[in-house]
Amino acid sequence: METATLVTIFISGLLVSFTGYALYIAFGQPSQQLRDPFEEHGD
């Protein structure tokens, strides 16, 4: 394989991994610990 192909696959893998991790933090088990500023602000 060419170097450019390997670099493209590596960067794409990093992007997919980061996106998956961000979705896990936002909607997965750790999201229960996040605070919701809209819930804290009562009108």
From Swiss-Prot:
Coiled coil: none annotated. It is a single-pass membrane protein. Its main location: plastid. This is Protein PsbN. The keyword Thylakoid applies. InterPro entries: PSII_PsbN. Belongs to the PsbN family. May play a role in photosystem I and II biogenesis. It is found in: Plastid, Chloroplast thylakoid membrane. It comes from Dioscorea elephantipes (Elephant's foot yam). The keyword RNA-binding does not apply. The chain crosses the membrane at residues 7-27. GO terms for cellular component: chloroplast thylakoid membrane. HAMAP family: PSII_PsbN (MF_00293). GO terms for biological process: photosynthesis. It comes from the Eukaryota. The lineage of its organism: Eukaryota, Viridiplantae, Streptophyta, Embryophyta, Tracheophyta. Keywords: Chloroplast, Membrane, Plastid, Thylakoid, Transmembrane, Transmembrane helix.
